[in-house]
Amino acid sequence: MSHLILTNGDSAAGLLREAGIDGHVVPWRDVLHEGPVPETATDAELRDVRAGYLADGTVRRRDDVLRDLAARDAHLDAHQDYERIELWFEHDLYDQLQLIQILSMLGARDRRQDVFLVQAPTYIGMQKPDNVLRFRELEFAVTEAMLINASEFWAAFRKPTPEALAEKAKIAPEGFPFLRQAIKRALQELPGRTDGLARTERQILYSVDRGIAKPGPLFARVLNMEEAAFLGDWSFFRILSGLCTCSCPLLEGLTEHFEPSVLQDDTRRKAFITADLALTDLGRDVLAGTVDFAEHNDVDRWLGGTHLTNDTLWRWDDDADELDHL
């Protein structure tokens, strides 16, 4: 029998393979802090929803994404074929959501023995092959209580309203030193109580207002404003593009609406990441907190199982650490 190694994405998976880790390495890949992650009766139904969101039709086709997700989950269905399962994950939101999903799935499959967790306080994919395995000294066995807690957090994330998730953000469950902060960071992507902006959107406007006007350096600046950076370039540029292409833009100057194919073409990519951005008058007012983004633009996005629209607009009050539902 062999070992199964699950980690966040391709960079970490490739590095662990290069380091010679003993086992079959599988990247999880899903960007769970983006798009719908609703309650579903089966894992297959959730895969179908996620494939529909993750596919862009050019760089990633839906059938390919669905096949990759199914192949990934098949390793958990066949967990009895592995005498040992290791989970190698990081401290940020991207990883912590993947971690609670995997543990919830393992618990549902009654895998309660020989599951081990490594939670790195930094980024696995940015290490070197000759030092990444040092994180194994952080390894410990997953307990029954951890499986239960992970399932509860995962279920809360998928609820159609965020109240349960906000309650979970008050809890620091044993064995998950980074989960509470990650869940709070997820809630900060809800529209703000007064300005209607997600934290990432607010950080973008703040940085442009202070002279970081090109998308490439802006991406680096916004990541540096995070306690634990979790956004990839596709995620960031999609949010940036939304601020430029909404009905009443907060930013101007972007060369085109972002889609993943932009980064596959050298000419388009260079023009996109070197564009000169500037706040519109509305952008300055929203940043100042005197105008609400949602009063001028449509809201249509997801946080886990919560579909945010102008009619169902859950907000997050960062000062009070609580939800606000107007």
What is the meaning of each model-derived region?
Residues 117-139:
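Short, conserved secondary-structure transition motifs
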Residues 212-223, 232:
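Short acidic, hydrophobic short linear motifs in intrinsically disordered regions
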Residues 133-209:
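A conserved mid-domain beta-alpha-beta active-site/ligand-binding segment of alpha/beta enzyme cores
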Residues 14-18, 37-38, 95-103, 126-131:
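A short acidic (Asp/Glu
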Residues 57-108:
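Long, hydrophobic/aromatic-enriched structural stretches that serve as scaffold segments
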Residues 1-67:
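A structured, charge-rich N-terminal accessory region that forms the first stable segment of a protein
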Residues 246-326:
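C-terminal engagement modules used by replication, chromatin/transcription, nuclear envelope/ESCRT
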Residues 223-257:
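Charge-enriched amphipathic alpha-helical scaffolds
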